[in-house]
Each structure stands twice: as structure tokens, then as C-alpha cells.
């Protein structure tokens, strides 16, 4: 049998390289999922343990190009205003409305919308990045967002009140011929969603629920010769009243807090569910000085008790009507504003940003030029003066 011969390889040649096996796709995806889960766990722990620090991190990233002074303020906005001016923050843009004009400035201070007005009494309502500017008793409404004018609306009645809500939805209370009052609900484009004509009760103001399914109107009616207040609740698919919650006192301000309707009267702060269930925070004879309903899960009230020598009291209340925290206030309060998890109080000599426990998150001294404060949900605040506004970045 013939012997087989094998050729020897060249030992001086480079040794063959081992070919690395490709990792199966499932294994790679599993590894990426583990890494992503670990990162999310770290972020979640950080958020849960210190939300204030997390908001500070967000601000440092979002406003890294802002030129700040030593106090942490960035001077962004220049405008003209007068004693009638109203202000709103629209996702970083500043809206200034007076009886003579509307001006909208973007986050760089550039005017993106301007129009002249001839209003006798201007009013403004803003929420969730949109605003309505109107004249009390007039028929024209300007609907705006951070980019400019959405729609100029000419309504069929005299406007009593407008309340902006979540998702751009808003309620307009007006006097229409043939009825005591009418409430119209619109979406963020100014398109009609719902109309309710009241022939029995005078409706003072109204709000849309956070989920956009209900409308609640503050009603005033007579019972045995005396006036009675209530919150009438309607589903936006029916003109039949779904529920009613009894209130005491006239309604000064209305909105939503923690998924419930919230009405501030001269007697108490009321929280009403869509089924009519009412919880309240009684003012105990004190007078309501200021109210902030813009936070996610709490309302803030500034109360003055003239019976006890004019003592001023600041309270934070949750949607169950329970006082979360409170403090005595010795300084004059020029303005207050709530957003997200924060409350900004503009005193005559300083600005203080609190959390819902009334713990100080930030303090800014020397605010003599500021007349209004607009709290932002990220923990920053806009300080508005007569002709200029600055952004405070703690």
C-alpha cells in the first residue's frame, strides 16, 4: 500500500488567528437590557431620594448657555408694560398682556407675537403651555402658545371668565342672550367641544377636569331668599348634571389639583371629585389674601387673620383638604406662584422657593425691581418687573 505523504507547514509563518465567534443577537440584546436596567435603576433611585437635586441637574443642562450673574439670574426679557399688565410663562416663553397690547417673547427674548389692544379690563389665564387673553365683558379672546397666536376667537356673548386647563382644553363662561349664563369648552386649537346653557343658575366661572371628560361650573342660586354656592359637574357628552358639591362663600378662583376640581372661596378651599364628593380646608375665619393652584398635588393659600392682630399664615393643602405644612409670615408678600412640586413666594425683600413641606429650596435677595413671580415646574422662576424680567436659576 502506498504511503501517504504530508507536507509540513512553514514554521516561520505567523500562527493562524482564532476567529472570534459572533455573539448571538439575543445574548447581545440581553446584555444591553441589563445595562439599561441598571442605569434606569440608578436614575430612579436618584430621583426618588432627591428630586430637588435631579431638578437642579435638569436646569444645569437645559440652561447651560444662559449667561447668569452672581445671584443666578439671567436677564432675558425686555418689554413695555403698565399697571394693568398680566404675565404668564408658556414653556419658556414670556407672555405680557396689558389693556393696550399683547407681547409674546421666546426664551431668547425675541418677540414672536405682538398686537395692539383697546381693552378696558384685561384678563389672562394660563396653564400647561397655553394662555387666553381677553377683556372682561368683551367678546374677543386671543389663544396663544409658546410659538405665537393659535387663534383669535370672536365669541357670541360677553365673557365673564376663562379658565385654562390641562392638554390645552379651556372653559369660557359668558353671558349669552336667552340664558343666565353659558359655559363653552374648547380644545387647544380653539375648536368647540361642549356647550352648556344655564337657565336656572348664574355660573361665575368653570374649569375642565384634568382628564378632559368633565366640566365643573361654580354656580350661584337662591334658596329661601339667600344665595347658595355650589359646584355643578357635567360630563362633556351630556347636558344633564352628573353631580353637585355644596360650597360656602363666593368663588374667587378655580382650577384643578391632584385630579380634583379646586375652588377657593372666602370661607374655605374646596376639593371636589367628579362624583360630587367634597373635602375642604376651612380658613377658620381668616381672610384669603392670595392663592396658588398651579402645583401638581397641592394648593397654597395665604391667609390674614385680622381678629388676631393681622397675623399672616401660609398653608400648603393637599387634595384631601389636609394641611401638609404651614408657617407664620412676618414680611409683606407681593406675589406667590405654584408649579410642579414648588411654591415661589415673592416677599418685599427677597424671593423664596419652597417645596410642599415649606422647606427652603432657594433664596434670592435684592428683588426690589420685581412685581410678579412665575414659578416653573423645573424649579426655576421668572421675576417680572415693570419693563424687564429675569430668569432665576437656583
Where are these regions (language model features)?
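Hydrophobic membrane-insertion alpha-helices, especially the h-region
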Residues: 30-48
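Repeated scaffold domains used in trafficking and secretory/extracellular systems
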Residues: 28, 74-88, 117-129, 157-166, ...
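Solenoidal tandem-repeat scaffolds enriched in leucines and small polar residues
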Residues: 179-272
Amino acid at each position: 500500500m502506498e504511503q501517504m505523504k504530508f507536507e509540513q507547514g512553514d514554521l516561520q509563518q505567523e500562527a493562524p488567528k482564532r476567529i472570534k465567534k459572533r455573539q448571538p443577537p439575543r445574548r447581545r440584546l440581553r446584555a444591553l437590557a441589563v445595562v439599561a436596567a441598571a442605569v434606569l435603576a440608578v436614575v430612579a433611585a436618584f430621583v426618588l431620594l432627591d428630586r430637588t437635586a435631579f431638578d437642579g441637574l435638569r436646569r444645569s443642562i437645559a440652561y447651560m448657555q444662559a449667561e447668569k450673574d452672581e445671584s443666578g439670574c439671567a436677564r432675558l426679557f425686555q418689554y413695555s408694560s403698565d399697571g394693568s399688565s398680566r404675565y404668564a410663562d408658556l414653556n419658556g416663553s414670556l407672555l405680557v398682556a396689558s389693556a393696550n397690547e399683547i407681547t409674546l417673547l421666546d426664551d431668547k427674548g425675541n418677540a414672536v407675537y405682538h398686537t395692539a389692544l383697546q381693552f378696558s379690563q384685561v384678563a389672562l389665564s394660563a396653564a400647561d403651555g397655553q394662555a387666553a387673553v381677553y377683556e372682561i365683558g368683551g367678546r374677543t379672546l386671543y389663544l396663544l402658545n409658546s410659538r405665537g397666536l393659535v387663534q383669535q376667537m370672536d365669541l357670541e356673548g360677553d365673557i365673564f371668565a376663562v379658565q385654562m386647563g390641562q392638554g390645552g382644553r379651556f372653559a369660557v363662561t359668558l353671558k349669552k342672550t336667552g340664558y343666565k349664563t353659558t359655559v363653552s369648552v374648547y380644545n387647544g386649537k380653539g375648536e368647540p367641544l361642549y356647550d352648556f346653557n344655564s337657565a336656572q343658575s348664574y355660573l361665575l366661572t368653570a374649569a375642565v377636569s384634568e382628564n378632559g371628560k368633565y366640566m365643573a361650573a361654580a354656580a350661584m342660586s337662591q334658596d329661601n331668599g339667600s344665595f347658595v354656592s355650589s359646584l355643578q359637574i357635567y360630563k362633556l357628552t351630556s347636558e344633564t348634571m352628573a353631580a353637585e358639591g355644596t360650597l360656602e362663600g363666593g368663588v374667587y378662583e378655580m382650577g384643578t389639583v391632584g385630579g380634583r376640581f379646586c375652588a377657593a372661596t372666602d370661607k374655605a378651599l374646596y376639593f371636589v371629585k367628579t362624583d360630587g364628593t367634597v373635602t375642604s380646608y376651612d380658613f377658620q375665619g381668616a381672610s384669603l389674601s392670595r392663592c396658588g393652584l398651579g402645583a401638581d398635588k397641592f394648593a397654597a393659600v395665604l391667609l390674614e387673620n385680622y381678629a388676631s392682630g393681622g397675623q399672616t399664615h401660609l398653608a400648603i393643602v393637599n387634595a384631601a383638604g389636609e394641611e401638609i405644612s404651614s408657617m407664620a409670615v412676618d414680611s409683606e408678600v407681593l406675589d406667590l406662584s405654584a408649579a410642579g412640586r414648588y411654591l415661589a413666594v415673592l416677599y418685599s425683600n427677597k424671593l423664596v422657593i419652597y417645596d410642599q413641606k415649606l422647606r427652603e429650596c432657594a433664596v434670592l435677595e435684592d428683588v426690589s425691581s420685581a412685581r410678579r413671580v412665575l414659578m416653573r415646574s423645573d424649579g426655576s422662576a421668572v421675576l417680572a418687573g415693570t419693563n424687564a424680567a429675569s430668569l432665576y436659576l437656583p
